[in-house]
Amino acid sequence: MTQTLDAPGAVIAYDLREPAEPATTTPLMLIGSPMDASGFVTLAGHFTDRRVITYDPRGTGRSTRTDSEPESSPEQHADDVRRVIEASGGGPVDLFASSGGAVNALALVAAHPALVHTLVAHEPPTVRLLPDAGTAEDAVRGIRALYDRFGTGPAMVKFIEIVSFQGPIPPGFADEPGADPATFGLPSTDDGSRDDALLGQNLLTCCLFEPDFEALKYAATRIVVGVGAESTDELAHRAGRAVAAHLGVEPTVFPSNHSGFLGGEYGQHGDPIPFAAKLREILD
């Protein structure tokens, strides 16, 4: 069942999947950013014994922006998630959050810990926590500059390169020539738009966000930080380990990679069956 709610500057669409039998367990919410609800179809299918909540972040999918702001912040996304949880019957929920969604979930728990029983934050790309924070931040800013100058194709090429790069990000990363965008099926010409949900709206605010670790440490929420078994040394994996270290917990290794829960969404195949089993093990 799909519903919508009004939030400052946006209309947020969200979905409720009800279990076949009355649920006795905590509702499960699945979020990404800028990944919308369509990325969680496979994973949701492994939790038919729970009420499952998904949503489209503002400016993605069915969630339309009603303001003229060029960017969205993790705090804004966190407030949107709060509204969805409260509109869906209130918390607490168990929350699985992937990538940028994990960044937003950390902001949510810092502000509203009572809404989340267990947070599983899978590979949040918080580059300012890395040992190579300076060059990593320069690279992220460089990708945004490419987008502003040349549009989606060249910037997305460098984004793909940075998220798959293993090890510390070298100086001048974004200045090195990238592959032909057509190699990745990306446009080689600039259509003039600058409202891409990833490159325009969320790249800087997400990657440069610094969680409130004091608030997170004192939160009653159980926080589990996940990293992929096959994404070792990639930026988001390393950032996930950095978040875990700041929280004083050991990261939990999930099967597959950064997108391990995908079962064909966006043409990507992770290893969703063992991934879902690992998530269930944590939540149960």
Predicted features along the sequence, with ranges:
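Alpha/beta-hydrolase
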Residues: 135-142, 146-250
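Short beta-to-alpha linker loops that shape the active-site pocket of alpha/beta-hydrolase fold enzymes
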Residues: 56-60, 125, 257
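Conserved HGGG/HGGXW glycine-rich cap/lid loop of the alpha/beta-hydrolase fold
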Residues: 6-65, 70
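Structural beta-sheet core signal
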Residues: 30, 95, 225-227
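Catalytic active-site module of serine/aspartate enzymes centered on a nucleophile-bearing elbow/loop
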Residues: 247-284
